[in-house]
């Protein structure tokens, strides 16, 4: 997975 370091707030639960 290529996710930017910063968009890790509020995971899709």
From Swiss-Prot:
One of its GO terms (cellular component) is extracellular region. Keywords: Amidation, Neuropeptide, Secreted. It comes from the Eukaryota. The modification Leucine amide is found at residue 13. GO terms for biological process: neuropeptide signaling pathway. Its main location: secreted. It is found in: Secreted. Belongs to the pyrokinin family. Myoactive. This is Pyrokinin-4.
């Amino acid at each position: 997975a290529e996710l930017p370091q910063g968009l890790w707030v509020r995971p899709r639960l």
